[in-house]
């Protein structure tokens, strides 16, 4: 995903982004490190905050069955 890149481009700290989204800083760290996939609601909130489309921030890969 491109969360860290977008956050830094806007001069935001992880704590500031977490506060703006109503989540913990640890959640932001996990998102940026790709260890956590956000709910659709959180992904939508992140996209709205950055003024971008969800698919421009997140890279969705289909899992093989």
Give the positions of each predicted feature.
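Amphipathic, hydrophobic secondary-structure cores in small proteins
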Residues: 29-44
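Alpha-helical residues within the helix-turn-helix
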Residues: 8, 19, 48
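Short alpha-helical DNA-recognition segment
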Residues: 12-30
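DNA major-groove recognition helix of helix-turn-helix/homeodomain DNA-binding modules
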Residues: 41-56
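Residues in the recognition helix of alpha-helical DNA-binding motifs
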Residues: 6, 20, 31, 60
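A short, Lys/Arg-rich alpha-helix, primarily the initiator
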Residues: 1-9
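Short, charged recognition helix plus adjacent turn
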Residues: 58-65
């Amino acid at each position: 995903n491109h969360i860290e890149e977008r956050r830094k481009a806007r001069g935001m700290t992880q704590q500031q982004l977490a506060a703006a989204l109503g989540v913990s800083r640890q959640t932001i760290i996990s998102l940026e490190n790709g260890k956590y996939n956000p709910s659709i609601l959180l992904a939508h909130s992140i996209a709205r905050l950055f003024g971008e489309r969800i698919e421009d921030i997140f890279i969705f890969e289909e899992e093989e069955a």
